[in-house]
Amino acid sequence: MEFLQNIKKNYDEWTRITPQGLLYDRALFWLFVILLLIGLVAVTSASIPYSSRLFNDPFYFAKRDAIYVLLSLLTCYISLQISSSQWEKWHAKIFLFSVILLLLVPFIGTSVNGAKRWISLGILNFQPAEFAKLALTCFLASYFTRRYDEVRSRHVSIFKPFIVMLVLGCFLLLQPDLGSTVVLFIIMSGMLFIVGAKILQFVGLIALGGILFVWLVLTASYRLKRFIGFLEPFKEPYGTGFQLTNSLIAFGRGEITGEGLGNSIQKLDYLPEAHTDFIMAIIGEEFGFIGILIVILLLGLLIFRAMKIGRESLMLEQRFRGFFALGIGFWIFFQGFVNLGMALGMLPTKGLTFPLVSYGGSSIIIMSATIGILLRIDHENRLFRIGQARLRDD
């Protein structure tokens, strides 16, 4: 009850202080909603054959995805109520909670396709790796705010964020989940670049990350086979290159305008994970190059808004808000880039979803939380500018 009263109090305060036209970033909100709806339509189409075969219900995954979309909107609204100062205050607790969740996975986790990465919560299999991305972004935003001058000047300070990232990464690699570990590394690297770490240190850190990545690929036979399959997918079209060859066939069939909604052939048990990791291949087949271009444009605009909000925060000397928003922007960009690159054969296949579009409750809900955070940061920036303007007028 107290929580609902706080929501009403905050809303009344916003509407009293801020003109209606300045409540929130409408462009960001509608980009978010449109991508969710595109994802719902695409998942419904892509999952019908798979749902029919497994559950004798063609809309099994579609109904679950619709529930995830509703939960995502609720999550976005709840995260919108939390001030950036609260996120900054809770950064250590959020990070610790993320570590605890990752520690629980080997003991109470649910195995899917041979990997134990999820914790069953009834209707939702929650993936702690998704929460870890948010936890790391929040933690580093607070760390860089507190140690801003130190990170820019001292040589060893750049490796402290790396150690923090490595803690989460080690737990993820036990699942195993190299893809999410790489996302954590990119979030950390992107934020270090924005903070202004010395270029030689930054390059050295990237080189260290690259060496570790190569070592992890070479020391795991299944990763090495997947990498070889990525280099020559048509050499073993029914083996290591099976997913990639069928993904490329889907894009090829779509051509410019696509085969039409529901007319995909590759989703008929030819392309594994059609409604999750390879949703963009089905969109390419059914809506063609134009459909893919529209989705990329929408996500690109959303990322641009995130970066713009981060930049405005830094210009207002609100470093935590700025680093948090920019970290989220790097996260969304890299995950979308890797998923699309994987589907197009530009990158090795990894279990990363396309933001807000692919089927996956954990990914959609956590991504929606980040949108709520961005909307809140943008709103606080607007209030801050209004306050500055009033001071100048006085």
Curated annotation (Swiss-Prot):
Q: What does the protein in this record do?
A: Peptidoglycan polymerase that is essential for cell division.
Give the record's membrane topology: Multi-pass membrane protein
Give the residue spans that cross the bilayer.
28-48, 67-87, 94-114, 121-141, 156-176, 177-197, 199-219, 278-298, 323-343, 354-374
Give the protein name, as stated in the record: Probable peptidoglycan glycosyltransferase FtsW
Keywords attached to this entry: Cell cycle, Cell division, Cell inner membrane, Cell membrane, Cell shape, Cell wall biogenesis/degradation, Glycosyltransferase, Membrane, Peptidoglycan synthesis, Transferase, Transmembrane, Transmembrane helix
Asked if Transmembrane is a keyword of the record, the answer is yes
- Give the intrachain disulfide bonds: none
Q: In which pathway does it act?
A: Cell wall biogenesis; peptidoglycan biosynthesis
Q: Which PROSITE patterns has this protein been placed in?
A: FTSW_RODA_SPOVE
Location in the cell reads: Cell inner membrane
Q: Which organism is it from?
A: Haemophilus influenzae (strain ATCC 51907 / DSM 11121 / KW20 / Rd)
Broad EC category: transferase
Question: For this protein, what reaction is catalysed?
Answer: [GlcNAc-(1->4)-Mur2Ac(oyl-L-Ala-gamma-D-Glu-L-Lys-D-Ala-D-Ala)](n)-di-trans,octa-cis-undecaprenyl diphosphate + beta-D-GlcNAc-(1->4)-Mur2Ac(oyl-L-Ala-gamma-D-Glu-L-Lys-D-Ala-D-Ala)-di-trans,octa-cis-undecaprenyl diphosphate = [GlcNAc-(1->4)-Mur2Ac(oyl-L-Ala-gamma-D-Glu-L-Lys-D-Ala-D-Ala)](n+1)-di-trans,octa-cis-undecaprenyl diphosphate + di-trans,octa-cis-undecaprenyl diphosphate + H(+)
Alphabetized GO MF terms: lipid-linked peptidoglycan transporter activity; peptidoglycan glycosyltransferase activity
Topological domain ranges for the Cytoplasmic compartment: 1-27, 88-93, 142-155, 198, 299-322, 375-394
Q: Which GO terms describe its biological process?
A: cell division; cell wall organization; FtsZ-dependent cytokinesis; peptidoglycan biosynthetic process; regulation of cell shape
Q: Does the keyword Secreted apply?
A: no
Q: Which family does it belong to?
A: Belongs to the SEDS family. FtsW subfamily.
The residues exposed to the Periplasmic compartment are: 49-66, 115-120, 220-277, 344-353
InterPro entries, from UniProt? Cell_cycle_FtsW-rel_CS, FtsW, FtsW/RodA
Question: What Enzyme Commission number does this protein have?
Answer: 2.4.99.28
Question: What HAMAP family does the annotation carry?
Answer: PGT_FtsW_proteobact
Lineage of this protein's species?
Answer: Bacteria, Pseudomonadati, Pseudomonadota, Gammaproteobacteria, Pasteurellales
Q: Name one GO cellular component term.
A: plasma membrane
